[in-house]
């Protein structure tokens, strides 16, 4: 039978497991392809993409890819609180919350992560109202399709805890309480275009873009 394997992300461990279960090697990505996916999964790609998504006054978000001890220290000490992320991590793992002091522990953590992953992702803190994501499917030939929304929740540490099982329409209505629906549609269309250019021909499968609805005191948006 014709099989099309569609996991939520590939890595060496999954490839090894499927191969061990007798899966045809022709259906599995090569090690070279996995290396390419690792490159495109690096958070520095999101750092580069983020400025292109600032479509109007409803959008916020800053993210920096920092590579040196001096940059890490300056970023942490210039802010009352901030978040450092390992570039190759997800689901709320590989996070380090900082409160204005670049401690020896944080310094050591940054050094170890940068040695294996090239640098550190640094972001300011926001007053989060909702966690959500837009989900897409890339066909590998340049076409990226919007598949729907995901509304999820995380713990105090930022680690993923679970999803709310709602229809796309219900999630859309929930998010539209905070921002105009056109803002969501415009972002969806922008992401389809940007993701097609970025990964449309190098990746076949699902991908998601995590987002937040944030509140700012000056306008309560």
Cite the ranges covered by each PLM segment.
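Short secondary-structure junctions
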Residues: 55-56, 80, 116-117, 199-203
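A long amphipathic alpha-helix within ATP-dependent nucleotide-binding catalytic cores
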Residues: 158-220
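Conserved N-proximal alpha/beta basic substrate-recognition cap immediately N-terminal to
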Residues: 1-78, 89-90
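Phosphate-binding site of ATP-dependent enzymes
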Residues: 80, 103-161, 208, 212-221
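Glycine-rich phosphate-binding loop of ATP-grasp-fold ATP-dependent ligases
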Residues: 62-63, 82-107, 133, 156-175
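ATP-grasp fold ATP-binding core
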Residues: 60-66, 75-97, 111-128
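Well-ordered, non-membrane alpha-helical segments in soluble/globular domains
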Residues: 1, 43-51, 69, 102-108, ...
């Amino acid at each position: 039978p014709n099989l099309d394997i569609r996991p939520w992300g590939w890595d060496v461990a999954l490839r090894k497991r499927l191969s061990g279960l007798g899966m045809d090697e022709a259906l599995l990505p090569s090690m070279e392809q996995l290396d390419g996916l690792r490159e495109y999964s690096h958070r520095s790609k999101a750092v580069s993409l983020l400025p292109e998504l600032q479509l109007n006054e409803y959008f916020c978000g800053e993210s920096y890819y920092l590579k040196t001890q001096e940059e890490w220290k300056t970023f942490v000490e210039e802010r009352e609180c901030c978040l450092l992320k390992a570039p190759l991590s997800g689901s709320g793992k590989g996070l380090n919350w900082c409160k204005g002091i670049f401690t020896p522990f944080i310094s050591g953590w940054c050094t170890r992560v940068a040695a294996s992953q090239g640098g550190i992702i640094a972001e300011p803190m926001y007053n989060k109202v909702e966690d959500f994501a837009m989900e897409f499917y890339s066909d590998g030939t340049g076409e990226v399709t919007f598949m729907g929304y995901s509304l999820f929740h995380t713990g105090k540490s930022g680690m993923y805890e679970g999803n709310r099982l709602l229809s796309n329409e219900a999630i859309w209505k929930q998010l539209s309480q905070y921002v105009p629906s056109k803002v969501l549609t415009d972002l969806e269309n922008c992401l389809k275009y940007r993701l097609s250019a970025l990964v449309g021909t190098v990746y076949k499968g699902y991908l998601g873009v995590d987002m937040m609805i944030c509140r700012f005191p000056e306008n309560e948006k």
